[in-house]
Amino acid sequence: MLNTNVFCRPFDDLSDPLVKKEAIFAGKILEIAENKEIEILTSDILYGELSLISDQRKRDIIFNEIENVSQRKIKISDEVHNLAADLTGLVGDYSDSLHISFAAISNCDCLITCDRHLIKIKYKIESFLISKGLELAILTPEEFAESFD
């Protein structure tokens, strides 16, 4: 599962070297997905965040890319809500907790994100999920894309 920021990264300020690098790897992941080498799941939170993009053209381009690579859309459930509520104290942001919960509950291998805070606390998140009987790796676009080289 891809966090919203991975889909958006190619449209961000690429003058920042880290953002540019993330955009390149995000593009590689989307290419891998378009070639059907991986399965991309989407979620209600992804589409909810997408609706917040004020630039209509950017939103339409990202929406089309999501629709192009998505294999299946995961709907919100009580299980997702409950896990997100439990995670929010650790993560600090309910939307991020929802992304993690959707990915974990739907048995994704990983959540790919450019969110520096989530990357910083990824081992805490992964340990918390293990304590709940769930497994999910939190990866940067680079970490994921390099596993295909």
Report residues per predicted region.
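Anionic, Ser/Thr-rich low-complexity intrinsically disordered regions
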Residues: 38, 42, 46, 54, ...
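Short, solvent-exposed polar/charged micro-motifs at secondary-structure junctions
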Residues: 49-53, 82-86, 147-149
